[in-house]
Amino acid sequence: MEKLGVEPEEEGGGDDDEEDAEAWAMELADVGAAASSQGVHDQVLPTPNASSRVIVHVDLDCFYAQVEMISNPELKDKPLGVQQKYLVVTCNYEARKLGVKKLMNVRDAKEKCPQLVLVNGEDLTRYREMSYKVTELLEEFSPVVERLGFDENFVDLTEMVEKRLQQLQSDELSAVTVSGHVYNNQSINLLDVLHIRLLVGSQIAAEMREAMYNQLGLTGCAGVASNKLLAKLVSGVFKPNQQTVLLPESCQHLIHSLNHIKEIPGIGYKTAKCLEALGINSVRDLQTFSPKILEKELGISVAQRIQKLSFGEDNSPVILSGPPQSFSEEDSFKKCSSEVEAKNKIEELLASLLNRVCQDGRKPHTVRLIIRRYSSEKHYGRESRQCPIPSHVIQKLGTGNYDVMTPMVDILMKLFRNMVNVKMPFHLTLLSVCFCNLKALNTAKKGLIDYYLMPSLSTTSRSGKHSFKMKDTHMEDFPKDKETNRDFLPSGRIESTRTRESPLDTTNFSKEKDINEFPLCSLPEGVDQEVFKQLPVDIQEEILSGKSREKFQGKGSVSCPLHASRGVLSFFSKKQMQDIPINPRDHLSSSKQVSSVSPCEPGTSGFNSSSSSYMSSQKDYSYYLDNRLKDERISQGPKEPQGFHFTNSNPAVSAFHSFPNLQSEQLFSRNHTTDSHKQTVATDSHEGLTENREPDSVDEKITFPSDIDPQVFYELPEAVQKELLAEWKRAGSDFHIGHK
């Protein structure tokens, strides 16, 4: 891995039992004997299982340095180092011949090699772009490709090998040769099914490496084996720009060649420390150690997994990576000890992330801030906080609108103060900003009203349990309950993660009810069932709850069940709006329910409605309603909020409503002004049911289409009004804007 301060992600092992190696070998021997008189072709292609898989691990040579040499060919034959801060994070082989090593201090590298050419590699953009080009190229050979950082990929060639073997004739199978090296110079048995499969895999691996060089100018090593663990280990035996195939009989030889258990991919720093405390240092120690004692110390699943890894057993599948599930930018440094310095670094990281969001096209819905405090230990612990991104900010992300910088920096600094007591001395060595929960919104080309009436997004995209992987982050394999402490602040909106290496990249959302759970016969009068089905589930619940309360309270009740729901029901009926009196006090209660957040733990900054500017739209609607209550004549109504409820739902979801780009206050509150210096006053009269919002200019008069209620129109948020006007204009409706 080439990224500064980041270790390779562990592959991990599956917990499923593999078939016994000796029994499988005997079975193969029986198959070979029975088929010896039938020719080789008939015995090939047994049912694929763990032992018959063909996995390739591709590892690019000095990746960052190669990208720099491709960019500037004059550097090709010179000793080259890629510098990040005070370290040479990687160097080409010319520099390595002269004594320069990866992660060497710049000063030491210059002493070793005075003619060393250094290039700045702190901007990862070009490396990232080239990395994805490599992955896309490998996907042309097999669709099952798993990224491991920038410079490594796993490719599952099992199906491709199957197809090639089916195309070969019997005499051609006997002439199959290996491409590259065979580990330990083991002899090849062309009557062995597994040998033939791995040989074909080596030929495909050679084709992939040739394509990488011809199309991208990159060289790399490859390892061909029956699982990810062995493929990764064997790929580094012959370097650079070479490949090696591992036959099953040499598996134990490769495993025992490792000098220490921490060289086994999948065994991290903490687990290695625990094993060392038990007297386990070598692979053989781990193989022969008592399973019961190991399970007692590490837990059953971890103990079984790492003991299987020590025998070279790894059932973990190659996981199709697809688009990245998160974007992160990080910066490591010797010392950051002031809030101003931290803010400057966060702004730099955020600017880079915003560019990546523009290029990707998806919109992140969660932001995470990660810090690393100074520690004398070799492996530092990381802490993180994350929270949802307000919908009005999401609307601007990816549009190139840098007005989003200010609210995003505000959010990140609030997260920062929840981890760091800025009133006390602190010493940080790393800051990282991560955008996750990326969603490709189909509404990007649709109007806001279209979004309300379109079929709802799949449950997996809006709710349920999501797992987001940070591919460049090292995740320990120690039991999660021992390793990670996730505590939710009282608000439930900010998630805290503390790990030895990196945050656990998981976000939980409340599970939505299926639409079919709601009886359509209980809908309020005037509500179209088909339109109702397309509404977000929480709005459906609100409408139904209002209907239910109306039924039980009776006609003589003073309360009005659908006060805050009038904005929703206005989409169904004109008349219904005029029949419902309004009590702003109800809405105020609901608004406070959204904005108020319990204070944080002692020593950190509190999150409250006054400091959380990002929890509402650009104007503070709760504050506005408070002031309006002082000035307006308000009829008495129930003290209990009647319309907008967040009970029995995850605050992470409910605090920012499911409507995109609109806050709940914007949708359900009365639009309060058309001029920043002027407030309109609601009256108790019939006309006061909706505020008398004027067109943007006193010289403009809008003539609406015949089926549009002007009162309902002026109830909509300004962004929706503008979009409707634009849509009507494009559609050539019978409306016009007159100028006096």
From Swiss-Prot:
Q: Name the source's superkingdom.
A: Eukaryota
The listed locations are:
Nucleus
What is the E.C. number?
2.7.7.7
Q: PTM per UniProt? A: Monoubiquitinated. Protein monoubiquitination prevents POLI binding to ubiquitin via the ubiquitin-binding motif 1 and ubiquitin-binding motif 2.
- Short motif Ubiquitin-binding 1 (UBM1), span: 527-544
Q: Which residues bind a 2'-deoxyribonucleoside 5'-triphosphate?
A: Y64, R96
Q: Ranges of Basic and acidic residues compositional bias?
A: 672-702
Stated name of the protein: DNA polymerase iota
Q: What is the lineage of its organism?
A: Eukaryota, Metazoa, Chordata, Craniata, Vertebrata
